[in-house]
Amino acid sequence: MKRTFQPSTIKRARTHGFRARMATKNGRAVLSRRRAKGRKRLTV
């Protein structure tokens, strides 16, 4: 049986990246929450 996690930087950025977050209203909400919390890294 193969492992389920097969890392890919492109897929990672496309789903969880900054531009992906900015594309939707909820994504922008995620960023604002992370800014409010004081996260050093907002996205991957």
Swiss-Prot record:
Which InterPro entries does the entry mention?
Answer: Ribosomal_bL34, Ribosomal_bL34_CS
* Keywords noted in UniProt: Ribonucleoprotein, Ribosomal protein
UniProt GO cellular component terms: ribonucleoprotein complex; ribosome
Q: Does the keyword Metal-binding apply?
A: no
Pfam families listed in its UniProt record: Ribosomal_L34
Q: Name one GO molecular function term.
A: structural constituent of ribosome
Hey, which family's this protein in?
Belongs to the bacterial ribosomal protein bL34 family.
What is the protein's given name?
Answer: Large ribosomal subunit protein bL34
